[in-house]
Amino acid sequence: MVSVKKIVASALVGVLMFSAVGCNMVEKTQAAIDKTTVATVNGEKITLGEVDSHLKGVFAQMKSQYGDKYMDDPQVAQQILQQRQSVVQGLVTDKVLGIEADKLGIKPSEEEIKKKVDEQFENIKKGMGDNFDKALEAEGYTEDTFKDVIKNQVINQAVQDYIIKDVKVTDEDAQKYYDENKQQFVAKDSGVLTKHLLFENEEEAQKAYDEIQSGKTTFNDLFTKYENNKSENKKPIAENLGVVPAENSGLVQEFVDGLKPLKEGEISKPIKTQFGYHIIQAGATYEKGAQLPFDDVKSQIIQILKQQKDSEKFKADMDQWKKDLNVKVYDDKLQEGLKISK
């Protein structure tokens, strides 16, 4: 399960105003430091206090390791500066995407947002179990402020889906990539070519399995239907895992146990892991060093190229939007309260 810290690092959003910075060479009150403008988006300010509100866990860790005057340590100060730079870029991205969601008319309704926020929150909480509250507290979030993080993720995802909706990868693109990168598609170990479908819940997985068994659809049809979902961060996910060795595959044990008895072309019943419910398909067996045929890795290549094209399209649109919204980031202001070595 993804940790709260990782989710917070990917989202980089929130509303809680908190600061734990010290004084620098120029005497300023803490309130003045917190109000320092470190970026603007369409004239709207982002303050250092907003940035530091996402670093409470970092500050607590630094204080525990280096003592109360941790910000006076140039090495620690440099680490905090890097964290601030990462956070402010995330906050800028969130504001830009929020503005564009409204402009494009693609912002989900409040009801849709609440439903998705509640679902994701409960999934994260359930996945982390007893560690959730402690992890949330360690990162400086309450349940409400963490839900604000997820809310921004939901809005951002809507814009990202809009940006990449027309991105396509053709069979010709995939063939060209294969021909130019054949060395990437050599079996690193002896094992079974493995694909799987990953569903959010047991009901969806069982329905898909039953439809495959009844002949209403096929595993390959569903794989094609869902193969772009991974890049769009939504389930069901269709994924080609390549050649999976019998030992030391790095996969969770439940998945390995589900794959083991399958013969070529067979599929498993829905298998529960910490990630959801899988339907696994076993493909051909390959020896270490064997060149994998194009048809066996085509779906894998399409996913690689789709992710590349999605990233390029997203970056191009974001760069233009930042220009249109006159985004400015004041890197020097991110050094407030820190003793940075020159």
From Swiss-Prot:
Q: What does this protein do?
A: Plays a major role in protein secretion by helping the post-translocational extracellular folding of several secreted proteins.
Sorted alphabetically, the Gene Ontology BP terms of this entry are: protein folding
Q: Look up the EC number in the record and give it.
A: 5.2.1.8
As for subcellular location, the record says: Cell membrane
Ranges for domain PpiC come to 189-284
Q: Where is the lipid attached (S-diacylglycerol cysteine)?
A: 23
Read off the InterPro entries from this record.
Foldase_PrsA, PPIase_dom_sf, PPIase_PpiC, PrsA_foldase, Trigger_fact/SurA_dom_sf
The record's section on PANTHER family has:
FOLDASE PROTEIN PRSA, PEPTIDYLPROLYL ISOMERASE
* Lipid addition sites, N-palmitoyl cysteine: 23
Query: What's the top EC group for this one?
Result: isomerase
Name the gene for this chain.
Answer: prsA
Q: What is this protein called?
A: Foldase protein PrsA
- Coarsely, its chief localization is membrane
Q: Which HAMAP family match?
A: Foldase_PrsA
Q: What residue stretch is flagged as signal peptide? A: 1-22
Protein family per UniProt: Belongs to the PrsA family.
The GO terms this record gives for MF are: peptidyl-prolyl cis-trans isomerase activity
Q: Can you state which reaction this protein catalyses?
A: [protein]-peptidylproline (omega=180) = [protein]-peptidylproline (omega=0)
Keywords of this entry:
Cell membrane, Isomerase, Lipoprotein, Membrane, Palmitate, Rotamase, Signal
Provide one Gene Ontology cellular component: plasma membrane
Q: How does the record classify its membrane topology?
A: Lipid-anchor
